[in-house]
Amino acid sequence: MSLVRRSNVFDPFSLDLWDPFDSVFRSVVPATSDNDTAAFANARIDWKETPESHVFKADLPGVKKEEVKVEVEEGNVLVISGQRSKEKEDKNDKWHRVERSSGQFMRRFRLPENAKVDQVKAGLENGVLTVTVPKAEVKKPEVKAIEISG
């Protein structure tokens, strides 16, 4: 059993790692024409909470800021969406491998009550989208001392 296989024996660039579950997966899940978009459609996003804010980071290499939308809907749902277009193809081009994904993506996150949704900021730098949602200061309950008579 070989760990490396060729998609096309005549193409020296077609080496793939062998996947023992590949044939099982293909028999259960039918192939679609959107296989190249599957990875991008489920954009991975990190969400961390700091004492001051909620910070979301998404790796979006090759995506321009005009192709990304950051919105707050229903009062407290952060929506990050966008699209990476396919590269223009020339009929004379011969592709040896297509691994970069393209297509649309959308992710939704329900923000906690302490999120200041009117102060959300977003920036795209070096292919990383960073969305910062400031948190409202937690008011400590006021303690009122009661004098005890007697």
From Swiss-Prot:
One Pfam match: HSP20
Gene3D superfamilies registered for this protein in UniProt: 2.60.40.790
Coiled-coil portions: none
Keyword terms: Cytoplasm, Stress response
Matches recorded under InterPro entries: A-crystallin/Hsp20_dom (IPR002068), HSP20-like_chaperone (IPR008978), Small_HSP (IPR031107)
Subcellular location: Cytoplasm
The UniProt record lists the keyword Transferase: no
Cellular component, GO annotation: cytoplasm
Major subcellular location class: cytoplasm
Region feature (Important for thermostability under elevated temperature): 1-42
sHSP domain segment(s): 36-150
Induction context: By heat shock.
Signal peptide feature range: none
Keyword Cytoplasm set for record: yes
Gene Ontology MF term list: unfolded protein binding
An individual GO BP term: protein folding
Subunit and partners: Forms oligomeric structures.
Homology family: Belongs to the small heat shock protein (HSP20) family.
Protein name, entry field: 16.9 kDa class I heat shock protein 1
Origin species: Oryza sativa subsp. japonica (Rice)
Biological classification of the source: Eukaryota, Viridiplantae, Streptophyta, Embryophyta, Tracheophyta
